[in-house]
């Protein structure tokens, strides 16, 4: 791809990102005005958010008086669907801004890495598809209404992570300069991942626990991964626990767009495996070519993915704030370091 062709694609991505961001803002306004934002009934916060919340509280304690820091930390680390809404909108707003910065930096510079990184940034906008879930919810949530939007989201999440991984793998290979073919392969793999990832659209409650102890099933209920008949009434199903023992649990339809994920363990490992392999690929590039700026890019990529991971949860205000900070700051460092590589050459 030539510089002029790449610039046209990035410019189109900026326009598309701005359009998708505008649609997300309209969706958010519709959700808030119609009272469709669901109440969060789950207090089980993932380990990454626990760690982020504790770090955020230490920062607040250092900056503010102890009483004010504790009260603010209690609000910022409590699960909230409002923070999820802001995380979705913030992710969509970050994409066109970072793409504009990328285009200005590389307007006259050719870099294969940046072509794939722009694909990553463009894919971030499709987190806004999650806003269709509270809009589609009308008292009962069918399998189709819940699964289709989240399969779209999972496709673009997978494509974004694979694009980051490909940016380091294909940076210096002459044979893989056919970026269109590589992107097609990445889209195919991302589609297969999203198609066969189990999407859960229900809550599961153990009878001995209250609503505050709600958990998400890690095992599929059916072949499609969700309840076939969602009537709004509690149902009793039999599933296998981690110890391979059948356990009776109460199941209620899920209406919280925060938790429309696939299998959590797979989702988590996919993010962190991509982070490690992406950093390793740029580290190998830096060692092979003896260019120190590639080491900076390698160090920035795990923080980019960590910020993205926090924003996909967006479960607390601390996760939302830290995620936006990491995503934008690390992306700027990555773009600047790759730009210095090609200016130096």
From Swiss-Prot:
Keyword Transmembrane: yes
Entry's transmembrane regions: 9-31, 84-103, 116-138, 148-170, 182-204, 269-286, 291-308, 313-335
Entry annotated with the keyword Isomerase: no
Membrane topology field: Multi-pass membrane protein
One Gene Ontology cellular component annotation held by this UniProt entry: plasma membrane
Location relative to the cell: Cell membrane
Keywords in alphabetical order: Cell membrane, Membrane, Transmembrane, Transmembrane helix
Major subcellular site: membrane
Highest taxon of source: Bacteria
Protein name, entry field: Uncharacterized protein TP_1003
Annotated organism of origin: Treponema pallidum (strain Nichols)
